[in-house]
From Swiss-Prot:
<dbReference type="InterPro" id="IPR015424">
    <property type="entry name" value="PyrdxlP-dep_Trfase"/>
</dbReference>
<keyword id="KW-0963">Cytoplasm</keyword>
<keyword id="KW-0627">Porphyrin biosynthesis</keyword>
<comment type="pathway">
    <text>Porphyrin-containing compound metabolism; protoporphyrin-IX biosynthesis; 5-aminolevulinate from L-glutamyl-tRNA(Glu): step 2/2.</text>
</comment>
<keyword id="KW-0663">Pyridoxal phosphate</keyword>
<dbReference type="GO" id="GO:0042286">
    <property type="term" value="F:glutamate-1-semialdehyde 2,1-aminomutase activity"/>
</dbReference>
<comment type="subunit">
    <text>Homodimer.</text>
</comment>
<dbReference type="InterPro" id="IPR005814">
    <property type="entry name" value="Aminotrans_3"/>
</dbReference>
<keyword id="KW-0413">Isomerase</keyword>
<dbReference type="Pfam" id="PF00202">
    <property type="entry name" value="Aminotran_3"/>
</dbReference>
<feature type="modified residue" description="N6-(pyridoxal phosphate)lysine">
    <location>
        <position position="265"/>
    </location>
</feature>
<dbReference type="InterPro" id="IPR004639">
    <property type="entry name" value="4pyrrol_synth_GluAld_NH2Trfase"/>
</dbReference>
<dbReference type="InterPro" id="IPR015421">
    <property type="entry name" value="PyrdxlP-dep_Trfase_major"/>
</dbReference>
<dbReference type="InterPro" id="IPR049704">
    <property type="entry name" value="Aminotrans_3_PPA_site"/>
</dbReference>
<dbReference type="GO" id="GO:0006782">
    <property type="term" value="P:protoporphyrinogen IX biosynthetic process"/>
</dbReference>
<comment type="similarity">
    <text>Belongs to the class-III pyridoxal-phosphate-dependent aminotransferase family. HemL subfamily.</text>
</comment>
<dbReference type="GO" id="GO:0008483">
    <property type="term" value="F:transaminase activity"/>
</dbReference>
Length: 428
């Protein structure tokens, strides 16, 4: 029994399922999760001392790599002044200014402490601003675990939402409509059905919680036009994509202007953080300037702001995103080439520093139903093969992979060589 195995058994006695977030339990791939002791650059190290090339990056925030010296130094300096004040600080002003500088659609910003808090607050604000109750989300898109957002289509894209978890009253879920990602017609039908009841559309501009699904051409533009036509707000959830796919997020990459944006992950440099912002007239509707209430004890935490600002400054370096995208393309295309070489069908998607791969014969995966029809047996086999080779991927076929600027030529070559060996074994 490894030290990770021992820790997992110990954890299950005091923590539900032995983990503090379900995907970490390895239920999607089987076996026991690796307990991590430390991380540096492109590597994480488990409790048994084994090193892994990491393509999870704490689920996205570690875009510069783990334990980056400038971020670490910023945190250490901030700690010297205290951990939390419950009062305004200059750091949170600087963070808001930096976000607004990099994302033009965000005229004002409110800091919170998690992505869930950001999306939950943005939804409440949209409902208050429009005086409408219903929201529209997409099947397979994840926006945190707030009650109104843990909903997917019941019996097709055009049905009223059904709760995806016990503990969510149907009275909450009935106000959440679910459409099919990358299919505008399903959205149009719902707006025709409820023309004056839908407050907003919320979506991941690159769906990173059904693996990695970019928007098809015209999809985001179509959503913008529908919102304008019916007086609804467009909320782009960039908790995952913000400053991950480009300097101005997915909205900058695809040239789309939302009314509200939610952020997290990258803006904290590895610390707990979230934010939402957008049009000034909408943001002025939130307390204390408006009637929509939102608050948080640790919002704008100085340690998180310090870490985030240090990371954001580094992300402004010339050519950084082009280099990151090139690395991501190399890994994704390399996986597909190695799989196909050994007669294993694979489809890939990648945008900026995100990538996904699917064990399927379909040339392109653009919808959630295609993701669910992929080969369910090949992913765990590939996953554990790569884990044995010292490559740490997301332990679920429904999660995107992430690269960092710390992934160099050595790590890329070793990863692709490992994939070649694993696919060769799988083909036997």
């Amino acid at each position: 029994m490894t030290r990770s195995d021992e820790l997992f058994e110990q954890a299950k006695k005091t923590i539900p399922g032995g983990v503090n977030s379900p995907v970490r339990a390895f239920n999607g791939v089987g076996g026991s999760p690796r307990f991590i002791d430390k991380a540096d650059g492109a590597y994480i190290y488990d409790a048994d001392g084994k090193a892994y090339i990491d393509y999870v990056g704490s689920w996205g925030p570690m875009i510069l790599g783990h334990n980056h010296p400038k971020i670490r130094q910023a945190v250490l300096e901030a700690v010297e002044n205290g951990l939390s004040f419950g009062a305004p600080t200059e750091l949170e002003v600087k963070m808001a200014e930096k976000v607004i500088e990099m994302v033009p659609s965000m005229e004002q910003v409110r800091m919170v402490s998690s992505g869930t808090e950001a999306t939950m607050s943005a939804i409440r604000l949209a409902r208050g601003f429009t005086n409408r109750d219903k929201i529209l989300k997409f099947e397979g898109c994840y926006h945190g675990h707030a009650d109104c957002l843990l909903v997917k289509a019941g019996s097709g894209a055009l049905t009223l939402g059904q709760p995806s978890s016990p503990g969510i009253p149907e009275d909450f879920a009935k106000h959440t409509l679910t459409a099919t990602y990358n299919e505008l017609e399903s959205v149009k039908t719902l707006f025709e059905q409820y023309p004056e009841e839908i407050s907003c559309i919320i979506l991941e501009p690159v769906a990173g919680n059904m693996n990695c699904i970019p928007p098809v051409e015209g999809f985001l533009e179509g959503l913008r036009a529908i919102c304008d036509q019916y007086g609804a707000l467009l909320i782009i959830d960039e908790v995952m994509t913000g400053f991950r796919v480009s300097k101005s997020g997915a909205q900058g990459h695809y040239g789309i202007t939302p009314d509200l944006t939610t952020l997290g992950k990258v803006i904290g440099g590895g610390m707990p953080v979230g934010a939402f912002g957008g049009r000034k007239d909408v943001m002025q509707f939130i307390a204390p300037t408006g009637p929509v209430y939102q608050a948080g004890t640790l919002s704008g935490n100085p340690i998180a702001m310090s870490a985030g600002l240090a990371q954001m400054e580094e992300l402004c370096a010339e050519g950084l995103y082009q280099e990151l995208a090139a690395k991501t393309k190399r890994i994704a295309e390399g996986f597909k080439a190695a799989a196909n070489k050994h007669g294993i069908p694979m489809s890939i998607n990648y945008v900026g520093g995100m990538f996904g791969f699917f064990f399927t014969e379909e040339e392109k995966v653009t919808r959630f139903d295609q993701v669910t029809q992929c080969d369910a047996e090949k992913f765990p086999e590939f996953y554990h093969g790569m884990l044995d080779e010292g490559v740490y991927l997301a332990p679920s076929a429904y999660e995107a992979g992430f690269l960092s600027m710390a992934h160099g030529e050595k790590e890329l070559e070793e990863t692709l060589a490992a994939a070649e060996r694993v696919f060769a074994k799988m083909a036997k």
